[in-house]
Amino acid sequence: MRVLVVGSGGREHALCWALSSSPLCDALFCAPGNPGIEDEAACVNVASDDIDGILKLCKKERIDFVIVGPETPLVAGLVDKLEAQGIAAFGPTAAAAALEGSKAFTKDLCAKYNIPTAKYQRFTDAAAAKDYIRKHKAPIVVKADGLAAGKGVTVAKTTKQALAAVDAAMVAKKFGAAGGEIVVEDCLEGEEVSFFALVDGTRALAFGSAQDHKRVGDGDTGPNTGGMGAYSPAPVLTAELETAVMEKIILPTVHAMRDEGRPFKGVLYAGLMLTRDGPQLIEYNVRFGDPECQVLIPRLKSDLLPALMAARDGELLDLELQWRNEVALCVVMAAKGYPGATTKGSEIRGIDAAAAADSTIKIFHANTKRVGDKLIAAGGRVLNIVARGRSVREAQKRAYAAIDKIDWPQGFCRRDIGWRAIGRRRASAPLPEKTP
């Protein structure tokens, strides 16, 4: 089978790393890929949002199966166009991708089908939104309806912050068309966790949990980012809670999408808040998370490719996945200045020494470039250092030991990835046999 992965980040590197070892994979391509992915796949310089370019690439290379990494081409209908040309693809159609592409759509779906989520109101008028906020007061959450590169959500601690978020989205048009409508919702209290499930249109199969670290600084300080690290599984998500998530959130969503004429196939990524009233949905993403994918994939013992094919083909019923009885932890290294303006072009040394430090270490590239024989940072999030261990603490220790071998003065990372789990007494205990 000839397989194409669409994307260029750490998520796509993790996917290519797993797919390259599949006996079913005869040839592996990535568009556009990165220098790290070149070790696993043939990288082709076609942008992930260049739908016509991807279609031409598939025809030229006789691609049998496409796995779409980022959300933008999914929402734009890449899967629809691939399938229309007879090319099998893993990921939702544009209609089903509305679960991520429109916050308002998802909130309305939850309301219609009694899926637990925060109380909310939709607005297309800034003045009406402000009146609602003044009436309900902070803390309150303001969300741009459409895709905003992970920057469209404001958890406002004060009414002033909430009103400013409305102005940014609807008056200043900070997010363009994505902010033409906003959702204002109650601020849930509890602990956040990410949960993943493969979906085949009618059924869902748990694909693990994770907790990420959005803030740029230690102690969860500073501005939000795309994610500075993650670990899997999330100890806070007990077997009992996982069952509740599947029965009250994931499966009702899958059935709702089927009933709405938008059957969902792909991976469903639920951002959850574990509240006193049980798990509640914060938002859906319709693709693997980044950096969450980088900690899910190293724990998977089963062949990834047939699992993704089963989701696309509507055949999850008989699929069973095997998982390593270990924790995986990822630390993201970013260029200094991130998430603001960053310097590009600095050289990174010591990658090979870091990767060889421990057999559990895997380094997934994100925004790197190769210039001659030098590895160059291209700004933003640059590297993902992943380690496995019997506990979060052990995996954390291994990851930072590897990072300390990397010579990159212009880069930085958080030094406390995993702090939530380590703070729990059971974090250092052996994991139970089944930890999907």
Regions found by a protein language model. Give the residues of each.
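ATP-binding N-terminal substructure of ATP-dependent carboxylate-amine bond-forming enzymes
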Residues: 1-95
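Solvent-exposed alpha-helices and their adjacent loops that cap or buttress functional pockets
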Residues: 21, 36-38, 60, 90, ...
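Short acidic-hydrophobic, aromatic-tinged amphipathic segments that line or gate anion-handling sites
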Residues: 43-49, 121-125, 156
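A conserved helix-loop-beta module that forms one wall/lid of the active-site cleft
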Residues: 90-152
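Internal nucleotide-binding/catalytic subdomain
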Residues: 152-293
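Active-site "cap" helix and flanking loop/linker of ATP-utilizing ligase/carboxylase catalytic domains
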Residues: 246-268, 285-358, 371
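Generic C-terminus detector
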Residues: 368-372, 376-432, 436
